[in-house]
Amino acid sequence: MRIGFGLDVHKLVENRKLILGGVEIPHDKGLLGHSDADVLIHAIMDAICGALCLGDIGKLFPDTDMKYKDIDSRVLLRKVFEIMDDMGYEIGNIDSTISCQKPKLRDYIDKMRENIAQDLHTNTFNISVKATTTEQLGFEGRCEGITANSVCILNKKDL
């Protein structure tokens, strides 16, 4: 068994789509980044990479490489799955928290869990996604950005 932790933060800006867990969320701002800036999927990928001692996602998918410009983060998550699978591991479980003041995410969480479970070839029971606010404190509370944290347990596959 291996444990990994991931964290990602992106700034909210106008004229960008807000994508979390592969779900487009109606909002007046989106997250700024080289890819689609999906902080939830980025935190999950970092957790998996950490558990496998691969470094962070910037090492695997550098923002200096134009082939990752505006890429769908689910494509990258599937690549991380392939690496994990090739190394002989599978998802035990993932627990993630998204921190933002707005928008409210409750109605989108089930679809996020489904997307992530599909890309990681696991059951949705193994994928937890929660959302919270910072009670209007800090940059999340001022609606300047969104943070996601994730922890994962990977199990060695039975051969």
From Swiss-Prot:
GO biological process: isopentenyl diphosphate biosynthetic process, methylerythritol 4-phosphate pathway; terpenoid biosynthetic process
Pathway where this protein functions: Isoprenoid biosynthesis; isopentenyl diphosphate biosynthesis via DXP pathway; isopentenyl diphosphate from 1-deoxy-D-xylulose 5-phosphate: step 4/6
InterPro entries: MECDP_synthase, MECDP_synthase_CS, MECDP_synthase_sf
Keyword Metal-binding carried by entry: yes
A GO molecular-function annotation: metal ion binding
Residues annotated as binding a divalent metal cation: D8, H10, H42
Catalytic activity annotation: 4-CDP-2-C-methyl-D-erythritol 2-phosphate = 2-C-methyl-D-erythritol 2,4-cyclic diphosphate + CMP
Top-level taxon in the UniProt lineage: Bacteria
The protein's enzyme class: lyase
Pfam family, one: YgbB
Record-linked PANTHER family: 2-C-METHYL-D-ERYTHRITOL 2,4-CYCLODIPHOSPHATE SYNTHASE, CHLOROPLASTIC
Protein family (similarity comment): Belongs to the IspF family.
Record-given protein name: 2-C-methyl-D-erythritol 2,4-cyclodiphosphate synthase
Species the sequence originates in: Finegoldia magna (strain ATCC 29328 / DSM 20472 / WAL 2508)
